[in-house]
Design a protein with these regions (language model features):
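Substrate-binding pocket helix/loop in short-chain dehydrogenase/reductase
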Residues: 17-18, 25-30, 112, 123
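Active-site loop immediately N-terminal to the catalytic Tyr-X3-Lys motif
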Residues: 19, 66-72, 94-95, 130, ...
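Active-site loop-to-helix junction immediately N-terminal to the catalytic Tyr of the SDR YXXXK motif
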Residues: 21, 67-75, 87, 115
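Active-site helix of classical SDR
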Residues: 41, 77, 85
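Alpha-helical segment proximal to the catalytic Tyr-Lys
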Residues: 46, 90-94, 151
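Residue(s) in the substrate-gating loop at a strand-loop-helix junction
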Residues: 61
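C-terminal helical subdomain
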Residues: 101, 124-149, 153, 160-162
């Protein structure tokens, strides 16, 4: 079949203070979160260009905008997604392909399940909507960006974080 929608949603963390971070911790996060974005998109972009249609949605993170102590590798990988998204959007717009990013805040996932109750409460207390997000919150905006309703939106980042980062 023809691929017209690509969602790049890779993400791992290997948190450590930079002075203690190993090259392996740095490289594993950059390779998974950023280099995979390049590799997967490159596999599908030619087909989308030929078909003159497509939606590419890159999942970043609120940490890509705000930074976070102990996450220089993760925040670097996620902030680079914004430049990739904007540059690619300019490259492929003439072929009716949109490229956008979504920056989730703290979402209930396997990654956030590893946090202690105290850590979760500290995070929730900093979120104006006073709750963590759900996978459905991210799915809803992803469906919108993949739809014809978003055909005039490209090169953008949509924050879905309950007001944590404004």
């Amino acid at each position: 079949g023809i691929t017209t929608i690509l969602i790049n949603n890779a993400g791992v963390t290997k948190d450590n203070l930079l002075m203690r971070m190993s090259s392996e911790e740095w490289n594993d996060v950059i390779d998974t979160n950023l280099n995979s974005l390049y590799r997967v998109t490159r596999e599908f972009i030619r087909e989308m260009m030929k078909q003159k249609t497509g939606r590419i949605i890159n999942i970043s993170s609120v940490v890509g905008m705000s930074g976070n102590a102990g996450q220089s590798n993760y925040s670097s990988s996620k902030s680079a997604i914004y430049g990739f998204t904007k540059s690619l959007a300019k490259e492929v717009a003439s072929r009716n392909i949109t490229v956008n990013a979504i920056s989730p805040g703290f979402i209930e996932t396997d990654m956030t399940d590893k946090l202690s109750d105290e850590q979760k409460q500290a995070i929730i207390s900093a979120i104006p909507l006073s709750r963590m997000g759900s996978a459905k919150d991210i799915a809803d905006i992803t469906l919108f960006l993949a739809s014809d309703s978003a055909s005039y939106i490209t090169g953008e980042n949509i924050n879905v974080n309950g007001g944590l980062y404004m």
